[in-house]
Amino acid sequence: MAFGTEPIPTGLADPPIDDLMEHADSKYALAIFAAKRARQINSYFTQLNEGLLQNVGPLVEYKSQEKPLSIAFREINEGLLEETLGEDDLSEGN
């Protein structure tokens, strides 16, 4: 059993926010992008329990207790998703 600190410390966000920002125009766009994907992943897990499969599941390996938002961040970081703005996104806040 090892004690002490990790050689490469991990922060609260893994992958780091700086890496994720390479895939979005702004931190706000990243938050919306990740939240929408996390909702899709959450719906997938709910539908899986009900025997329905209408959403696409996680595109990366995940742990059983991992949060949908963490999975979405890893998908974004690995370049598995592409951010596109729809009409609803363009009209929000205007």
UniProtKB/Swiss-Prot annotation:
Q: What class of enzyme is it?
A: transferase
Q: Name one GO molecular function term.
A: DNA binding
Which GO CC annotations does the UniProt entry carry?
DNA-directed RNA polymerase complex
Which keywords does this chain's UniProt record carry?
DNA-directed RNA polymerase, Nucleotidyltransferase, Transcription, Transferase
**Xref: InterPro entries:** DNA-dir_RNA_pol_omega, Pol_omega/Rpo6/RPB6, RPB6/omega-like_sf
Q: Output one GO BP term.
A: DNA-templated transcription
User: What's the domain of life for this entry?
Assistant: Bacteria
Q: Name one Pfam family in it.
A: RNA_pol_Rpb6
For this protein, what is the EC number? 2.7.7.6
Q: Does the keyword Cell wall biogenesis/degradation apply?
A: no
| Reaction catalysis annotation | RNA(n) + a ribonucleoside 5'-triphosphate = RNA(n+1) + diphosphate
- What does the record give as the function of this protein? Promotes RNA polymerase assembly. Latches the N- and C-terminal regions of the beta' subunit thereby facilitating its interaction with the beta and alpha subunits.
Oligomer and partners:
The RNAP catalytic core consists of 2 alpha, 1 beta, 1 beta' and 1 omega subunit. When a sigma factor is associated with the core the holoenzyme is formed, which can initiate transcription.
Q: Which family does it belong to?
A: Belongs to the RNA polymerase subunit omega family.
Recorded protein name is: DNA-directed RNA polymerase subunit omega
